[in-house]
Curated annotation (Swiss-Prot):
Name this polypeptide is given: Xylulose kinase
GO biological process: D-xylose metabolic process; xylulose catabolic process
Role played: Catalyzes the phosphorylation of D-xylulose to D-xylulose 5-phosphate.
Reaction equations catalysed: D-xylulose + ATP = D-xylulose 5-phosphate + ADP + H(+)
Molecular functions per Gene Ontology: ATP binding; D-xylulokinase activity
Site residues (Important for activity), renumbered to this chain: 9
Keyword hit for Transmembrane: no
List of residues binding substrate: 82-83
A family per Pfam: FGGY_N
EC number: 2.7.1.17
Conditions for induction: By D-xylose.
Stated family: Belongs to the FGGY kinase family.
């Protein structure tokens, strides 16, 4: 019987725990769902105990149902949903439900941070103080729940709380710490200036560790609870985007990730902390020690296609609808789609912009609209590539995951619009794979995450850009880039109309 590592993927709706062997093969996998607490619009919370019990149930199932010998589980690590605020008292007991990344109640606190710190905040953290980040949530509790705040002695993020319950040690890894927007990225330490300006005790900030650092071993109490042994080593882990980048092999400067889920992410490996995108793109510590990544988010990437299919092709198969785009031409016969149907994050931080089809002609067929949606999502990603190129970014390979990697046609569209080689993964497992790789590297199975990727990460067919298509898409993207400014005022007026009618 071989030795294993566990990758714990702590998501927003479920936890998935994967057991992998030395060759990177998944030998067993279990998951457990948990609930979201939505007390009113804009509020999204979870009970941290649900994460602990869900993770434990998944581990118990691996041991009992999948017959995994606990003595052969050498180590484990985590991928965690980012930004969620977990407040603990002096005895490290949870004080209130966790406020999650998708909670938007803290707009007044964001405005306060901007007023007090201005551009200096972005200079220190490399990020804007968005409602999704942890700091605004801390301030919201401070200002709206003074009794809770008076008892609060520590804050951690979701995976950190699960790790604490397993090991008895409080810590936060750098990749998650940058997402709190309390970290001085250049110095690699909690920002005294930000804490002082906002009257947040530095003592609340947990110790910082690297993703591959040993955070402890399983306690006797948790061993009895879960079936793991007290010899099981527990490593720091990473934020879900960092772990996802590791699992996709984004471990070299020449590589960029193109991820199409409900939202879309373009993520680039960064070598040093000197790169500054002035808050237009998020800038975070990577799971690789002393390395970083930048990322931009398209809010409605896969959701654009889901909306289109639900509205115009509800009874048809996803694959067939995507394939129909091949009947159209490069550039969708002169039809453009902007995927701003729920607002946009990057490069335009604009909650009121809305999507559009531009250039609709009486000769257009449904397949032209399908292709326009596929292309429009990638044009939005191309906007982010332009930012990289303007800042001297040099990369030649794009790793595509999610919905965009499931269609050869869509992979070729990406290669042509990006004008770069695009590859998919043959063993796409998302952040859970990255978490397992962190544990494997921490244990010394491999010298580095890059070495681990040589064994654990496998790429599929490479799609090379077609020079003729590249030229056509360059013309279409130049037109696409004009649509935002041309429709911004119209979108605001239409949104005002809709709100007045509600």
């Amino acid at each position: 019987m071989g030795k294993y590592v566990l990758g714990v993927d702590l998501g927003t709706s479920a936890v998935k725990v994967s057991a992998l062997d030395h060759s990177g093969q998944i030998v067993a996998q279990e998951s457990f769902d948990y609930d979201l607490i939505q007390k009113q619009p804009g509020y999204n919370e979870q009970n941290p105990e649900d994460w602990v019990s869900g993770t434990t149930v998944a581990i118990v199932r691996l041991i009992l149902n999948d017959h995994l010998d606990a003595s052969n589980i050498e180590g484990l690590s985590y991928s965690g949903q980012m930004h969620g605020l977990v407040l603990l008292d002096e005895n490290k007991k949870v004080l209130r439900p966790a406020i999650l990344w998708n909670d938007t109640r803290s707009t007044p606190q964001r405005e306060e941070i901007e007023a007090k710190l201005g551009d200096e905040f972005v200079h220190i953290t490399r990020n804007q103080p968005l409602e999704g980040f942890t700091l605004t949530k801390l301030l919201w509790v401070k200002q709206n729940e003074p009794d809770i705040w008076a008892k609060a002695k520590y804050f951690v993020l979701p995976k950190d709380y699960v790790r604490y319950r397993m090991t008895g040690n409080l810590a936060m890894d750098y990749s998650d710490a940058t997402g709190t927007v309390l970290l001085d990225v250049a110095k690699g330490e909690w920002s005294q200036k930000i804490c002082a300006a906002l009257d947040i005790p530095m003592s609340m900030c947990p110790p910082l560790i690297k993703s591959i650092d040993l955070a402890g071993t399983v306690t006797p109490a948790y061993a009895e609870f879960s079936g793991l042994t007290t010899d099981t080593k527990v490593f720091g882990g990473a934020a879900d985007n960092a772990a996802g980048a590791v699992g996709a092999g984004i471990l070299h400067p020449n590589m960029v990730l193109s991820s199409i889920g409900t939202s879309g992410v373009v993520l680039k490996y960064e070598d040093n902390a000197d790169v500054n995108y002035h808050g237009v793109l998020q800038f975070e510590d990577h799971a690789i020690p002393d390395k970083f990544y930048s990322m931009g988010v398209t809010l409605a990437a896969g959701y654009s296609f889901t909306w289109f299919k639900k509205t115009f092709a509800p009874a048809e198969d996803f694959t067939d609808v995507v394939a129909s785009a091949a009947k159209s031409t490069v550039g969708a016969n002169g039809l453009l789609y902007t995927p701003y149907i729920v607002g946009e994050r990057a490069p335009y931080a604009d909650a009121d912009i809305r999507g559009s089809f531009t250039g609709v002609d009486g000769t257009h067929q449904r397949y032209d609209f399908v292709r326009a949606v596929l292309e429009g999502i990638i044009f939005s990603f191309r906007d982010l590539f332009d930012i990289y190129e303007e800042n001297g970014g040099d990369f030649d390979t794009v790793v595509s995951i999610g919905g965009g990697a499931k269609s050869p046609l869509w992979l070729q569209i990406q290669a042509d619009i990006f004008n770069r080689k695009v590859v998919s993964l043959t063993n796409e497992q998302g952040p859970g794979m990255g978490a397992a790789m962190i544990a494997a590297t921490g244990l010394g199975w491999f010298d580095s995450l890059q070495d681990c990727a040589e064994t654990f990460v496998h790429f599929g067919k490479a799609y090379e850009p077609n020079p003729d298509n590249v030229k056509k898409y360059e013309k279409m993207h130049a037109i696409y880039k004009q649509v935002y400014q041309q429709t911004k005022t119209i979108s605001e007026q239409l949104l005002d109309y809709r709100r007045a009618e509600l």
